[in-house]
Amino acid sequence: MNFKPFDKKIWLATAMKHGEEIKYIQEAFDTNWITTEGTNLVAIEQQMSEQIGCKYAVALSCGTAALHLAVKLAGVKEGDTVFCTDMTFDATVNAVMYERAVPVFIDTEYDSWNMDPVALEKAFELYPNTKVIMVV
């Protein structure tokens, strides 16, 4: 086979910019808050908690960290069964594996790519004590 490279790069996702990002990035550098702390981070956590109507919100470094925290907060422990869609990024399963739980993959629907409810129902027959369903 003879493959021709693409003429232009195909981006998985592009950065969404709304105008003031450089200002906040520069402020983080200038104040030496290039960590998991700082006034900008505290402000966004406060704004998020107000927006969704909860007492607290926490900003995390990535989706994997968010999924891991969700699994921990759901009380998943070693040996627990967790249903995961078979059409997902590895972060979903990594969050389960970090807790030494057992991921069980559920087929997806062809048209929607969502977890197939018929397959999910059958999985509950096989694993009735499942702790969590990871719907991503």
Where are these regions (language model features)?
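N-terminal "arm"/small-domain region of PLP-dependent enzymes with the aminotransferase-like
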Residues: M1-I34
